[in-house]
Amino acid sequence: MAAVNLRHIEIFHAVMTAGSLTEAAHLLHTSQPTVSRELARFEKVIGLKLFERVRGRLHPTVQGLRLFEEVQRSWYGLDRIVSAAESLREFRQGELSIACLPVFSQSFLPQLLQPFLARYPDVSLNIVPQESPLLEEWLSAQRHDLGLTETLHTPAGTERTELLSLDEVCVLPPGHPLAVKKVLTPDDFQGENYISLSRTDSYRQLLDQLFTEHQVKRRMIVETHSAASVCAMVRAGVGISVVNPLTALDYAASGLVVRRFSIAVPFTVSLIRPLHRPSSALVQAFSGHLQAGLPKLVTSLDAILSSATTA
């Protein structure tokens, strides 16, 4: 027996849906004789009489109606496949795995994700916070589609694009005497209650060295693991600190005072792409979204720092 092909199913579905050979031919953009010929061939191939022909009109048989029920189920499945393909082509569907430092998942990512997901509502994102150096190891192992780090080193098996570079900033509780200054110097921290990151943090080590070189002694009263925790404690009046500008910007809206530091301590955001993990249009779309959205944070930070009162 000859094989049934998709064209046979398409013609049968069109005839059942349209109710006549003429309308079916119109739906399929072909001629009525072609539809009639292929429908007869389909009946012969499957060995079933699908229609009764009465006075030039087609009437489905019981077998035809039952077969149409099965065709309908398959037809809807085919529609879903076509729709899914269109969605993937237009980035409307898909999954994206992003590994990043915890500071990024708590600062700029939430506000950048909202407009992206509004544009692609059927996309799902998996955000995996991780500290260095394990973060860079995961990216080298090609475990995620994209990575966001503060390192200036490119992990093995990846490519790195610098997205943003800003200086660390000083953070103070509302009403602190130093808040009247527009720029703080290392000497301003002499004898002040200071909230620091953990001893293993590279920025903690850099700042400790800087204050030592300037012979400034701070009162190291609290040590914590994250910049978000530092900012929360500063806002509550526990002490003052120097932190990354992104976390400071996030807390500025809730009362944290942010000031420039007289010494540049660069803080960099880098986008990491694994070289041996299959890329996709979705990866490219999100990368472009990050590159377009991050500069807006610079504008917001500059506005806050520029509004500081000069002593």
Curated annotation (Swiss-Prot):
The keyword Transcription applies. Residues 1-61 form the HTH lysR-type domain. It is found in: Cytoplasm. One of its GO terms (molecular function) is sequence-specific DNA binding. Its main location: cytoplasm. One of its GO terms (biological process) is lysine biosynthetic process via diaminopimelate. Residues 21-40 bind DNA. Transmembrane segments: none annotated. Pfam families: HTH_1, LysR_substrate. It comes from the Bacteria. One of its GO terms (cellular component) is cytoplasm. Keywords: Activator, Cytoplasm, DNA-binding, Repressor, Transcription, Transcription regulation. The keyword DNA-binding applies. NCBIfam families: PRK11013.1. Belongs to the LysR transcriptional regulatory family. This protein activates the transcription of the lysA gene encoding diaminopimelate decarboxylase. LysR is also a negative regulator of its own expression. This is Transcriptional activator protein LysR. It comes from Escherichia coli (strain K12).
